[in-house]
Amino acid sequence: MEVYPAIDLMKGRAVRLYRGRRESVKVYGDPVKIAQGFSELVDKIHVVDLDGAFEGRPRNLEVVERIIEETGLRVQVGGGFRTYEAVGRAYEVGVENVILGTKALDTAFLERLTDEFGGITVSLDVKDGRIAVKGWVEEGSIKVRDAFEILRNYVNRFVYTSIERDGTLTGVDEIGRFWGDEEFIYAGGVSSAEDIVRLAERGFSGVIVGKALYEGVVKLEDLLEVAKCLRRG
């Protein structure tokens, strides 16, 4: 089990949203300083370009580049990666994993990326059992398990994001394992060490934690200790 602290970016600032709603934004400050704090405890973080997700193209890659240069952290980033050029630019600035959302359902595009780049990850952004699209603004028609059965032919690394839980601090979804040996990372509502234990029991290999850290609901050190114990078995 791995723990990935999250930084969501909007207009160059670190923010959090409630259930992905733009009007619910809460600002937490300088993302580079926040990343520097995380770098004392972890070597990899999760970054979301919210402007990119809403607008359809990355808008905060310069901030991501600064985070990498000034902290040495490994970074996985999502938000608006819908062209080959945008994905390529992210890898140029030093990103380790580019996370695709909506565009991953274009399997010709996905295949081209996986042929060219390593570390491509797909985010299954779920609401009511279906994949949400266009920055979570629209609910899609495809069921999450149907999407997974298609996408698993191209990638083996996924993020499962519960939109209804995101930013709520209400705990994690009750999800029955529907994947095999693919790497699955959970995001949405994580607010305690017990959540991490439950997710590990369901087969998740990683967890993304955001608002619970920013609001002081849980300490990153405590989550990392639990994750270490889980890895030991």
Swiss-Prot record:
Recorded catalytic activity of this chain's protein: 1-(5-phospho-beta-D-ribosyl)-5-[(5-phospho-beta-D-ribosylamino)methylideneamino]imidazole-4-carboxamide = 5-[(5-phospho-1-deoxy-D-ribulos-1-ylimino)methylamino]-1-(5-phospho-beta-D-ribosyl)imidazole-4-carboxamide
Pfam family, one: His_biosynth
CDD domains according to UniProt: HisA (cd04732)
One term of GO molecular function: 1-(5-phosphoribosyl)-5-[(5-phosphoribosylamino)methylideneamino]imidazole-4-carboxamide isomerase activity
Catalytic machinery residues: 8, 125
HAMAP family per record: HisA (MF_01014)
PANTHER family in alphabetical order: 1-(5-PHOSPHORIBOSYL)-5-[(5-PHOSPHORIBOSYLAMINO)METHYLIDENEAMINO] IMIDAZOLE-4-CARBOXAMIDE ISOMERASE
Protein name listed in UniProt: 1-(5-phosphoribosyl)-5-[(5-phosphoribosylamino)methylideneamino] imidazole-4-carboxamide isomerase
Organism: Thermococcus kodakarensis (strain ATCC BAA-918 / JCM 12380 / KOD1)
